[in-house]
Every structure is written in structure tokens, then in C-alpha cells.
Regions:
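Catalytic phosphate/metal-binding cores of nucleic-acid and nucleotide-processing enzymes, i.e., regions
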Residues: 1-64
Length: 64
């Protein structure tokens, strides 16, 4: 398995297969099948979550 990257963003929309996530500057779709873990940011008023995704996907989506 390749390297993983943590990515924090607000879930703006959800479908059966993906989340539309806003990182403060850009929106991007994250396929649920590629998310290795996710956790809710406890102090968040919005639906902020921390996702762990493959580094190659983060690069492809312009996250890193």
C-alpha cells in the first residue's frame, strides 16, 4: 500500500459513493471507496471531517 495523506474538509454533499468536500478554497469529490479512515472534528459547527486518503489521490485532486 502507498502513503496516506490526512485531509480536513467540510462535507457539503454526500451521495452513495462519494463526498463533496470543501477545504476552505476548493471543492472536490472524494470516492468513499478510496477513503481509508474518517473522523468528525469534534469542535466543528459544520460537518468538518478528517479523511485519510492515498497520496496519489490527494495529488490527483490537487489536495497536496
Amino acid at each position: 500500500m502507498g502513503s496516506l495523506v490526512e485531509f480536513c474538509g467540510e462535507v457539503r454533499r454526500e451521495t452513495q459513493k462519494a463526498y463533496l468536500v470543501f477545504d476552505g478554497a476548493h471543492e472536490t469529490w472524494l470516492p468513499k471507496s478510496m477513503i481509508k479512515s474518517e473522523r468528525v472534528v469534534a469542535s466543528s459547527i459544520k460537518d468538518d471531517r478528517i479523511f485519510e486518503i492515498p497520496e496519489w489521490l490527494a495529488r490527483e485532486k490537487g489536495i497536496v
